[in-house]
Amino acid sequence: MSADPRLILPLDLSSVSEARAMVETLGDAVSFYKIGLELLATDGMALARQLKGEGKQIFLDWKLHDIGATVERSARVLAGAGCDLLTVHAEPQVMAAAVKAKGGSDLKILAVTVLTSLTDADLIELGYAFSARDLVARRIRQAIEAGVDGVVSSPQEAALAREIAGPDFLVVTPGVRPFWSAKNDQARAATPADALKAGASHLVCGRPITAANDPREAALKVVGEMAGL
């Protein structure tokens, strides 16, 4: 069994050397990697370029959130690096700037709707007048209007995203936990099969793989759960 390109493995590790070791351990079981804020300050871009040179796909989960001009300049640099996916916060000005910056590159812009660790109660505490589902729907529509390529949404909102956005929109779902693993801090988790059936185009699955005694075997088990869906 080989890698499924719909499975994205987050390299949420403390150093580039640890991340590099994990990639070597996983071998051909994973072909798509997410590089987040943990590695941003420790040569994460160098790792991204290295992995791209080895034929891997790269998702920069940096959740850009600043004034439009700053987001545009930053996204333009990242588009030139040849990465595949980049996250920005789902605010109209931010999304429009990132879309403008990517130009004719292959970079796909993903809007972050609502973090999967947040519950409806959390959103009320933060001052939002919407449930997670309603806020996700609102931001998906704004993302479509801004011209982004997809959204990051929890498995529970994947069907909503697919219904609103149609078949060609990317729906990347973190908070994916195989049936044999714990939910950890993902308040709105689902199995790989559940997320794909709901409409997800890509799944982000981390600790069930990286914290396993045999990460490669765990990755292949997840790929097996995705097979045929």
Curated annotation (Swiss-Prot):
Keywords from the UniProt entry: Decarboxylase, Lyase, Pyrimidine biosynthesis
Any one of the GO BP annotations: 'de novo' pyrimidine nucleobase biosynthetic process
Lineage top rank: taxon: Bacteria
Positions annotated as active site in the UniProt record: K63
Pathway(s) this gene product operates in, as recorded in its UniProt entry: Pyrimidine metabolism; UMP biosynthesis via de novo pathway; UMP from orotate: step 2/2
Family: Belongs to the OMP decarboxylase family. Type 1 subfamily.
GO-annotated molecular function: orotidine-5'-phosphate decarboxylase activity
PANTHER family in alphabetical order: OROTIDINE 5'-PHOSPHATE DECARBOXYLASE
Entry-linked CDD domains: OMP_decarboxylase_like (cd04725)
Stated name of the protein: Orotidine 5'-phosphate decarboxylase
InterPro entries: Aldolase_TIM (IPR013785), OMPdecase (IPR014732), OMPdecase_AS (IPR018089), OMPdecase_bac (IPR047596), OMPdeCOase_dom (IPR001754), RibuloseP-bd_barrel (IPR011060)
Keyword Glycosyltransferase: no
Catalyzed reactions per annotation: orotidine 5'-phosphate + H(+) = UMP + CO2
A GO CC annotation given for this chain: cytosol
